[in-house]
């Protein structure tokens, strides 16, 4: 109990900046974090990546910090030539990828995901001891150049190649 400040780390991905520089930017903006003390919203002092709450604290006070974990698209600075026209997919701090064995045809290089594609996040308890996967509809290009809609599944990049060697994009 007493008068003191509590500082909570607010990750850059919550503040519409995937990194603390201009190398990467989010295409889609999302809502900010919310902070409550004992169920009531508070407006903290922000600075240096922290939200600071200064007050008189009592035993049993509860702080609730809600960090939005929405699916985002990231693009790199246009001067990174190899990344022009490409986007990364992120949910919270996790970067996602497509792995061949999760796609109906086992391929990944024949697919693209339009920037406005709706993606849904769901926990898959059976996959790699449990991970959140993203699903949606991608565009698939066949050898004749025809394009069709196909379902896709994206997994956390950190889990790629944990089920054997496979293609990834």
Would you name each region that the model predicts?
Residues 2-6:
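Extended extracellular/luminal ectodomain segments enriched in beta-structured repeat modules
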Residues 1, 15-37, 46, 50-58, ...:
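C-terminal beta-rich recognition modules with glycine/proline-rich loops and embedded aromatic residues
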């Amino acid at each position: 109990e007493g008068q003191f400040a509590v500082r909570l780390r607010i990750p850059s991905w919550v503040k519409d900046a995937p990194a603390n520089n201009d190398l990467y930017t989010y295409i889609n903006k999302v809502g900010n974090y919310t902070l409550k003390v004992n169920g009531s919203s508070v407006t903290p002092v922000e600075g240096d990546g922290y939200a600071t709450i200064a007050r008189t604290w009592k035993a049993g006070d509860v702080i609730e910090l809600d960090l939005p974990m929405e699916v985002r698209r990231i693009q790199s600075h246009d001067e990174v030539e190899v990344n022009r026209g490409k986007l990364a997919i992120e949910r919270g701090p996790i970067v996602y990828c497509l792995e061949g064995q999760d796609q109906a045809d086992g391929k990944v290089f024949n697919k693209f995901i339009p920037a406005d594609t709706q993606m849904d996040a769901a926990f898959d308890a059976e996959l790699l001891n449990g991970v959140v996967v993203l699903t949606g509809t991608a565009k698939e290009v066949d050898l004749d150049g025809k394009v069709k809609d196909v379902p896709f599944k994206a997994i956390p990049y950190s889990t790629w190649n944990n089920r054997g060697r496979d293609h990834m994009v």
